[in-house]
Amino acid sequence: MRADPAQCRLRQTGDVDPADGDGRRCHRRSPAYCGVRSGPGGCRHRYLISSLVSACLGFYYVHRVAHLTCRVSLKNLSGDIRNIGRTALPAVIGNLATPVGMAYVMAAMAPFGSQALATIGVIDRVIQVAFCVVFALPGALIPILGQNLGAMNTARVSQAIKMTYGLLIGYGSVTSLLLILLAEPLASLFHLAAERQVVFFAFCRWGGALDAHRAAIHCHLSLPQYGATGVRHTVRLVPRHLGTMPFVWYGAHKFGSVGVMLGQLLGNTIVAFCACVARASAHEKDVGHRDPFNREPIPPQE
């Protein structure tokens, strides 16, 4: 079969003009992208187009379908901003912790070469896949807890949390064992260089257990808590900074690239555990065991 000249050029240069080849190529792509060049230059234009289309569709459904828009009242705007800011500002600050901590890890790993940076990228992808269940748990658990907290059914809330921690322990143990057993096949799958397999093997053999514990703490810190919004996001911020920078700096100077990776995981685990203790103490002091809204408990339905 004769090769398409446009496909050959794509393999050689990575850039194909949409007019090259037959006209069916344009129909195999989204009509909105017709006329947009491929390659790095076209990617940013495609991203801009898709973002604009998504924003317009979102506004249409919010305004015309859900009818959630209204005229802005300057009289009530300042009060609404203050009320929203009490929760939104700590959340924004807490969410800045992960990119800042990861940037420091990348800066510490950069002196060890591009292969070391590539290994950290592989480890990050493996973590996202291996512990995907743990990272999805808060989003699945919060609606259940919110419904039962609203009904003052604390027994069911306690049962759900206990079952969650049991699942985390079992899932984390099995995942850590699988990482140990599959360390070499995974390294071959990602085509890691021989000198950088040491970092990946260290993660699979030691970092898996540390990250399982850290992921469990991540799930705990993501759970809602009345009266302690600022504390909750503060203790999410502290582990990513205090638990990253000193440990990564020491590990890089003493153990090289392996020390950077293990220092990050060990530091996050230690400081996150201390942050959980501080969060629990602050919650007991601020709220205790009473309902902050002074509601009467709703009897369970038969």
Swiss-Prot record:
Superkingdom, taxonomy of origin: Bacteria
Transport listed as a keyword: yes
Keywords noted in UniProt: Plasmid, Transport
GO cellular component, one term: plasma membrane
GO molecular function: antiporter activity; xenobiotic transmembrane transporter activity
UniProt entry tagged with the keyword Transport: yes
Role noted for this protein: May be a membrane-bound protein, possibly involved in IAA or IAA-Lysine transport.
InterPro entries: MATE_fam, MATE_MdtK
Name assigned to this protein: Uncharacterized 21 kDa protein in iaaL 5'region
